[in-house]
């Protein structure tokens, strides 16, 4: 949402000022197309016309990457997650999005997150601790557009219960990609059902989706059952 307008305004792909081909095979998962040390400066230098009239978002957001090459069976869960970049304007978002690999280009095992600034994409984060997540599944390599539209709806504050949303994550796995939206208060059924229904509408997603409490996921892992479904 652009702060200057009291009504919700949609951020769309047509507003992307500099679409680029990010098919650089030499780019490592989770890295910016520029040198990693120059990522922040590269992303904060959109065309001068956009610098003159930035469009602030209602919230600042941080991209996080979980590098599969850094994972090991001995490592604590979440220990390899690292922040990539924080953005607070529409222009900064597009500068970053245009210079990172999209899900179809990430290696198997990679997790890419976009969470509200100062919320870590971990169950242990105090804001996430009592929450849960909605999850959609996609054929391997076919989640790019849905990931983008999820981000646009989320950072553009298109959800009626946007304050309930912590962030979103795309998980790249052998047989499928998964996109999840994490929320704060899993027991608030009205909020969770609203978020799930709107998300399906935004993406025109016709398959059933389920909501799992983080607490259940911690206890039962893959055998955790959906508490809500749409």
Swiss-Prot record:
Molecular function as annotated in GO: RNA 7-methylguanosine cap binding; RNA binding; translation initiation factor activity
Disulfide bonds: 128-166
Residue positions binding mRNA: 73-78, 105, 123-124, 173-178, 218-222
Record's subcellular location: Nucleus; Cytoplasm
Region (Disordered): 1-53
Gene3D superfamilies membership: RNA Cap, Translation Initiation Factor Eif4e (3.30.760.10)
Keyword Hydrolase carried by entry: no
UniProt feature, compositional bias: Acidic residues: 22-38
Biased composition (Polar residues): 8-19
Note: Displayed sequence is allele PveIF4E(1), sensitive to potyviruses such as clover yellow vein virus (ClYVV) and bean common mosaic necrosis virus (BCMNV).
SUBUNIT field: EIF4F is a multi-subunit complex, the composition of which varies with external and internal environmental conditions. It is composed of at least EIF4A, EIF4E and EIF4G. EIF4E is also known to interact with other partners. In higher plants two isoforms of EIF4F have been identified, named isoform EIF4F and isoform EIF(iso)4F. Isoform EIF4F has subunits p220 and p26, whereas isoform EIF(iso)4F has subunits p82 and p28. (Microbial infection) Interacts with potyvirus viral genome-linked protein (VPg); this interaction is possible in susceptible hosts but impaired in resistant plants.
UniProt family annotation: Belongs to the eukaryotic initiation factor 4E family.
Protein name listed in UniProt: Eukaryotic translation initiation factor 4E-1
Organism: Phaseolus vulgaris (Kidney bean)
Gene that produces this protein: eIF4E
């Amino acid at each position: 949402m652009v702060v200057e307008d009291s009504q919700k305004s949609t951020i769309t792909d047509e507003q992307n000022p500099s679409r680029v081909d990010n098919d650089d095979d030499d780019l490592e998962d989770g890295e910016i197309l520029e040198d990693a040390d120059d990522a922040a400066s590269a992303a904060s230098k959109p065309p001068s016309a956009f610098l003159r009239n930035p469009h602030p978002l209602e919230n600042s957001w941080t991209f996080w990457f979980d590098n599969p090459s850094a994972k090991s069976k001995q490592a604590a869960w979440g220990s390899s997650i690292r922040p990539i970049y924080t953005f607070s304007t529409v222009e900064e978002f597009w500068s970053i999005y245009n210079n990172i690999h999209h899900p179809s280009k990430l290696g198997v095992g990679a997790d890419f997150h976009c969470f509200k600034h100062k919320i870590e994409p971990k169950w242990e984060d105090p804001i996430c601790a009592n929450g849960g997540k909605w999850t959609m599944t996609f054929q391997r390599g076919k989640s790019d557009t849905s990931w983008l539209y999820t981000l646009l709806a989320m950072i553009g504050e298109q959800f009626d219960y946007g304050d309930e949303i912590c962030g979103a994550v795309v998980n790249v796995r052998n047989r499928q990609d998964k996109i999840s939206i994490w929320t704060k208060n899993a027991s608030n059924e009205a909020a969770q059902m609203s978020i799930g229904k709107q998300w399906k509408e935004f993406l025109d997603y016709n398959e059933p989706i389920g909501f799992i409490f983080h607490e259940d996921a911690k206890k039962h892992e893959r055998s955790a059952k959906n508490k809500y479904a749409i």
